[in-house]
Amino acid sequence: MPAYRSRTTTHGRNMAGARGLWRATGMKDSDFGKPIIAVVNSFTQFVPGHVHLKDLGQLVAREIEAAGGVAKEFNTIAVDDGIAMGHDGMLYSLPSRELIADSVEYMVNAHCADAMVCISNCDKITPGMLMAAMRLNIPAVFVSGGPMEAGKVVLKGKTHAVDLIDAMVAAADSAMSDEDVQTMERSACPTCGSCSGMFTANSMNCLTEALGLSLPGNGSVLATHADRKRLFVEAGHTIVDLARRYYEGDDASVLPRNIANFKAFENAMTLDIAMGGSTNTVLHLLAAAREAELDFSMKDIDRLSRRVPCLSKIAPSVSDVHMEDVHRAGGIMAILGELDRAGLLDTSCTTVHSETLGAALARWDIRQSNSESVRTFFRAAPGGVPSQTAFSQDRRYDELDLDREKGVIRDAAHAFSKDGGLAVLYGNIALDGCIVKTAGVDASILTFSGPVKVFESQDDAVSAILTNKIVAGDVVVIRYEGPRGGPGMQEMLYPTSYLKSKGLGKACALITDGRFSGGTSGLSIGHVSPEAAEGGLIGLVRDGDRISIDIPNRTISLDVSEAELAKRGEEERARGEAAWTPKDRKRNVSAALQAYAMLTTSAANGAVRDVKRRFGKN
């Protein structure tokens, strides 16, 4: 039977000093012997998805104490990708994921905590905490701050549900008046919470449900709704139970690596494909799997993408459908239920709240459940009042969305498409693969071929789009923006948004070794691996070349002869130390980002660090 980790600092004569310090934090004699639970919060006033978390850590802490544990809260950093977007601030977003994972490890191991509740929400925070949970492998429960309500705006006499991306596109559309743009801006983000569509933050919070590490509703119940409070309360009780089961009952099944095993990662990726999640989720699931020491790779994602249909389309893939609509249709448990009925899930996987995923679906899938409380839970609705306060309203829809033929969530027989919402493409320009969010690609451009216009920075591409140098039929290539080449693998939300504002969203392709925001739609292909900075073929593309894309057959190719590519490769290598670097780009790369670039790996590996490669260790 494993001993409580915290005994290292709470027991024995030689720990008198440590106990003295614990006492100074409020612990009493009766607390030495209880599980010490880390409450890992991420409150910040910089990020709307986290601005309401300040008191929620203490809410969880009080519930932990009521259940017989000792709670100790600390904070991680949190970057707002939307505010960091479109300038050098975005260089720091993906690297912050590693800092978050490390900071959790540092705090939990330095203080010998026995278990943890991870209070996350936005883009890199949930992945960073997930990586830490898999790395530490102590009992853990995830609870997110929840999605924000979709904005509502009246334009030309019609009411539309809007979000951040709509405001960005409107601002770049010269046909929109300043007044309408300002109306859109003021309406797009009305409440606290993670941005309202199936963007990266909400995608990841949904995936924790499929991994079995969070409670039902974690990904979909609104930040402002009173029902979300129950998740925080239950997280506090659940983590104490898990800690006791492991340390006192010798039940290792409650550990993150045994819950989120290979089959659970397959379930999560299956959900991701079915709901058309953010392409960033591929990076983060690969990274978390690596921390769990699982051999889960791009090949597995490719395999799953060929058999899983698209069962839901949510903003940005379609307008007027947001997370509040997904919740009304039964949330993530409803999508998992449809996948189960299609024979696409392994329901024997365990969860932090149920013996198996199958048992969880029997209670929480609204097509199976007979529970009136479950149906009431999924009728939670937006309040329609601007608010930065959690649990500030308790409005409910009159009815659930149970339409599985034409509703927000479809059954397999009425899927939006036979192919799922994400796909892996391979070809000479992406030998290790690249990712496209097919749920956001118009059917007319699933196959596409066009002349290339090459840019070695996002800024140059944006300038070309806004000055009308990109025309229908073009393939825009942005390179040297990968994990190492950026460094930091910037998101390309501005280029894709500006293409839409110019009416080119269905007429152009954008290819990059960088990545895309969860808010991106259109023929946007990212994570091209190997990246240009590592000698990838994308570094040899020239203006006027043609690139052919065939999503149904999962291929992408640079239509240039092997002899010509070999010649270009020799010319590039002849540049010496300057080889495989951008020719004219001026970018201030800080020491912190240089350190990240030295240790990071390919997007095909989740852009995780490889210390062994850098220092030559086996």
Curated annotation (Swiss-Prot):
GO molecular function, one term: 2 iron, 2 sulfur cluster binding
Pathway the protein acts in: Amino-acid biosynthesis; L-isoleucine biosynthesis; L-isoleucine from 2-oxobutanoate: step 3/4; Amino-acid biosynthesis; L-valine biosynthesis; L-valine from pyruvate: step 3/4
Binding site for Mg(2+): D81, D123, K124, E491
Active site annotation, chain numbering: S517 (proton acceptor)
Gene Ontology cellular component list: cytosol
A GO biological-process term: L-valine biosynthetic process
EC number(s) from the headed UniProt entry: 4.2.1.9
Summary of the function given for this chain in its UniProt record: Functions in the biosynthesis of branched-chain amino acids. Catalyzes the dehydration of (2R,3R)-2,3-dihydroxy-3-methylpentanoate (2,3-dihydroxy-3-methylvalerate) into 2-oxo-3-methylpentanoate (2-oxo-3-methylvalerate) and of (2R)-2,3-dihydroxy-3-methylbutanoate (2,3-dihydroxyisovalerate) into 2-oxo-3-methylbutanoate (2-oxoisovalerate), the penultimate precursor to L-isoleucine and L-valine, respectively.
Annotated protein name in UniProt: Dihydroxy-acid dehydratase
Organism: Rhodopseudomonas palustris (strain ATCC BAA-98 / CGA009)
Gene field: ilvD
